[in-house]
A protein has these predicted regions:
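Extended, well-folded interaction surfaces typified by the phenylalanyl-tRNA synthetase beta subunit core
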Residues: 189, 422-584, 719, 772-775, ...
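Conserved mixed alpha/beta core segments that line enzyme active sites in large multi-domain catalysts
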Residues: 48-78, 158, 263, 269-338
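Mobile "lid/hinge" segments at catalytic clefts and subdomain interfaces of large enzymes
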Residues: 120-129, 133-135, 144, 148-150, ...
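Phosphate-backbone binding interfaces of nucleic-acid-interacting proteins
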Residues: 1-214, 349, 368, 372, ...
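Terminal amphipathic helices with adjacent charged low-complexity linkers/tails
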Residues: 198-224, 401-429, 436
Length: 805
């Protein structure tokens, strides 16, 4: 929201501070200021001058010598401007003055200083300016020539400050207005805040009654078919319209707000929209068939040509303004080409309404059109504003001589919105703020922002336009804003407090993050929504459960239209970005949800499951990733050996380098090398490894209860096993035999050799393990170890494994 400081000061007469003081104070009172632009910051010593005489330059065909009256004296100025003429009133920069930039519109920080000098041997004492050199442009000053000096109107006073005469002696302040403060999307709303901040009187315009003795109902009838989408519709008629430029003061304020002045009628609608925050629209009444306005939904497939000449495809959710036979406007967004105001209009219809903000936003998105008006409606306007803005516009019509306002107004307002009443509880406000502000001071703050106080009921009367004030905390915030956040000291919370702590689930997730970072992984955060095309990139079959997704009803676009059922796309996209930027040895992890619908179409919320995803390329391989997973399991209290199932259906992983992770009989995740085709789909030209852990499975088995055991004094006994193993038997199968048959003395086992070669029969491999046995309370005897080894060998034989001879 951009606002002219001069306009604010006109509504708050006692406000005489500079722009920096204003910005600082408004920010402290809660009206966050993003920045400001001082329009005349780089302009100095520029006056209105009048050319009294022109002579040819003796040594340059394209230059002329002008005598220019600047009020206090007549200066000689050499110029090459093609549009200079005797009698012209122009902006003149005096010797030592500054302009904002060049005539091509480029601005120079600090401006360009103008000095007296000679041009082709002839002395020149100053410079006459184009509008671009004054820091503006032809869009804001359409009467300015494309190439030449800016020519003032004949009434411009010679010798006066040209910057002030053009209205450039102003500052434009940019605010960040949150969506709950709809009232501040207007000059009046900001001015009310400024008056309260600086303890000055707020003087809004006094709107007087307008209209002749005729009845508007003789000119137009209105019916609203969809009152859920249009809570209020007001209309008035203006006849005998006379188009002319709007007055100088109005043009200056519109320019400061970035709005190009057009003519008196159009400028009034734009002016009122900025002043009140209420969009308005004008229709050529002679084009309204049947002299009837009908507010209804569009028909499915209906087409409509808007003011910009574009044909729009509509559906039944778009609200339309229609006459007896056709549509004449898209409600709250843009009028139609068929009812636009032209220079030949003599009678027009003014519209000010309150349309449903959500519908306006969705409609604009459907038809691909967003305007200044729709942006304001989207926020959710106060319907009580519509008639105030309408009457203000009609007042300006009469004051500026635009036309004759017909008496009366159409006002369809079936359910009036009232303000709310909140109990006045100063003790609660002080407790929330840690202050001791008197109740009388609080009431004073409320009255400054037009909140009433009913002494009989001890209630605060909140007007309908303050939709953000709903509870004690909101009222305490208003007290803090105008008491001054900078005056509130530091204090400890009063009252009783209860001990709290993080949940076990949260603590376990934090532990998992710590382990990931300990293993050299950096955290990534990616979107939870993605494109349906992701499944093709990941080689997911058409009938896969992973393709059953939650579809977003209002997506940002097709690429963000479903909720993810796999965490892989975000991780692979992040790895691809790093690879594309030539980053080497990248390790990333992400802790994020997947969304699994219980049934489709949705009848209840989908299941959200937290998953920990690892991804890496470069300095690691499958076994590096496996080691990371085993470290994670061990550090979270899962001390049993995990099993790895290579037969799991994981189409996005390499068929020979993948496995589901099985712990205690349950699948808790998967890991492997990304399928080469998938890696190519993500433009990664290295081997990529990923692992995914289902955190609920970890949390349900994890423990922070560590069991400490003393260091035994008894020695370890080792036995080496060299086996001939069929190739189809996995290492996990061998280790399962060790676990089941090793007995209580088997402390550890370690694979130290795998061999395939000439001395090994085809279809077999040689595998060697070192097994370590230790007693906790005694030295082991040979019989203890032999008994365990016999059971192990028997178990190995049962699955087709023999000792190597």
């Amino acid at each position: 929201m951009n606002t002219s400081l001069k306009w604010i000061k006109a509504l708050v007469p006692g406000l005489d501070c500079g722009v920096q003081e204003y910005v600082d104070a408004m920010t402290l009172s809660g009206s966050k200021v993003e920045g400001y632009e001082q329009l005349d910051a780089d302009l100095d010593k520029i006056v209105v001058g009048q050319v009294t005489k022109i002579e040819k330059h003796p040594d340059a065909d394209k230059l002329v010598i002008c005598q220019v009256n600047v009020g206090s004296e007549t200066l000689q100025i050499v110029t090459g401007a093609p549009n200079v003429f005797e009698g012209a009133k122009v902006p003149v920069v005096l010797d030592g003055g500054r302009v904002a930039g060049g005539h091509d519109g480029t601005k120079t920080p600090g401006g360009i200083k103008i000095k007296k000098g000679k041009l082709r041997g002839v002395e020149s004492s100053g410079m006459m300016c184009s509008i671009e050199e004054l820091g503006s442009n032809r869009e804001m000053f359409p009467d300015a020539p494309e190439n030449g000096l800016y020519i003032f109107d004949e009434d411009a006073p010679v010798g006066e400050n040209a910057v002030a005469y053009l209205g450039l002696d102003d500052s434009v302040v940019e605010y960040e207005i949150t969506s709950n403060r709809v009232d501040c999307f207007s000059v009046l709303g900001i001015a009310r805040e400024a008056a309260a901040t600086f303890h000055k009187e707020f003087v809004p315009p006094v709107v007087t009654e307008t209209g002749n003795n005729e009845d508007v109902n003789d000119y137009i009838k209105v019916s609203v078919k969809d009152q859920d989408l249009c809570s209020r519709y007001t209309a008035r008629v203006v006849k005998n319209i006379k188009f002319a430029p709007s007055p100088k003061w109005m043009q200056e304020r519109l320019r400061a707000h970035g709005i190009r002045p057009i003519n008196n009628l159009v400028d009034i609608t734009n002016y009122v929209m900025e002043e009140y925050g209420q969009p308005m629209h004008a229709y050529d009444l002679d084009t309204i068939e049947g002299k009837e306005i009908i507010v209804r939904r569009a028909a499915a497939g209906e087409k409509f040509v808007t003011l910009d000449g574009q044909e729009r495809q509509l559906d039944e959710n778009v609200l339309m303004i229609c006459d007896a036979k056709k549509a004449v406007g898209i409600a709250g967004i843009m009028g139609g080409e068929n009812s636009m105001i032209t220079d030949h209009v003599t009678t027009m219809l003014f519209e000010a309404a309150c349309f449903d903000g959500t519908n306006i936003r969705k409609s604009g998105k459907r038809i691909g059109l967003r305007t200044d008006a729709s942006a304001k409606f989207e926020k959710g306007l106060d319907p009580n504003l519509a008639m105030e803005a309408m009457n203000r516009a009609c007042q300006l019509v009469e004051e500026l001589g635009v036309g004759e306002v017909v008496g009366g107004a159409v006002d369809i307002y079936p359910v009036k919105r009232e303000g709310v009443k909140l109990p006045f509880e100063p003790d609660k406000y002080n407790k929330l703020l840690g202050t001791d502000i008197p109740a009388g001071d609080m009431i004073g703050y409320f009255e400054k922002i037009d909140l009433g106080y009913d002494e009989a009921t001890n209630e605060i009367l909140v007007p309908s336009w303050r939709q953000d004030l709903l509870c004690d905390a909101d009222m305490a915030e208003e007290v803090a804003r105008f008491y001054g956040y900078d005056k509130i000291g530091t204090s400890l919370p009063s009252g009783e407090s209860t001990a709290g702590g993080k949940s076990f689930k949260l603590r376990m997730e934090e532990k998992a993050r710590e382990i990931a970072e300990f293993c050299g992984f950096s955290q990534a955060m990616t979107y939870s929504f993605e494109s349906p095309k992701v499944f093709d990139k990941l080689l997911i079959p058409e009938d896969s459960k992973w393709r059953k997704t939650v579809v977003i009803s209002n997506p940002l676009g097709e690429d963000y239209s479903i909720m993810r059922t796999l965490p892989l796309n975000g991780m692979l996209t992040s790895l691809s970005t790093n690879f594309g930027r030539r980053n080497k040895d990248v390790r990333l992890y992400e802790m994020g949800n997947i969304y699994l619908p219980k049934q489709l179409p949705l009848t209840e919320l989908p299941e959200e499951r937290m998953q920990l995803t690892f991804g890496m390329y470069g300095d690691g391989d499958f076994f590096t990733m496996k080691g990371v997973i085993e470290e994670l399991l061990y550090q979270t209290g899962l001390r049993k050996k995990a099993q790895y199932d290579p037969h799991a259906e994981l189409p996005f992983l390499h068929p020979g380098r993948k496995a589901a992770i099985v712990y205690d009989g349950a699948v808790i995740g998967y890991l492997g090398e990304v399928h080469p085709t998938v890696a190519a789909n993500y433009a990664i030209k290295e081997r990529v490894y990923i692992a995914v852990i289902d955190m609920p499975e970890i949390v349900s088995r994890a423990s922070f209860d560590y069991k400490y055991e003393g260091i035994t004094n008894f020695p370890v006994s080792s036995r080496d096993l060299s086996m001939v193993v069929p190739k189809n038997i996995l290492v996990g199968d061998i280790e399962k035999v060790f676990e089941e048959n090793g007995g209580k003395y088997l402390e550890n086992y370690e694979l130290f050799d795998v061999y395939e070669g000439e001395q090994i029969e085809k279809g077999f491999k040689s595998v060697a393990y070192s097994l370590k046995f230790r007693g906790k309370d005694k030295n082991l005897e040979e019989s203890d170890i032999t008994g365990a080894m016999d059971k192990i060998l028997s178990g190995l034989k049962n699955i087709g494994i023999q000792l190597r001879g």
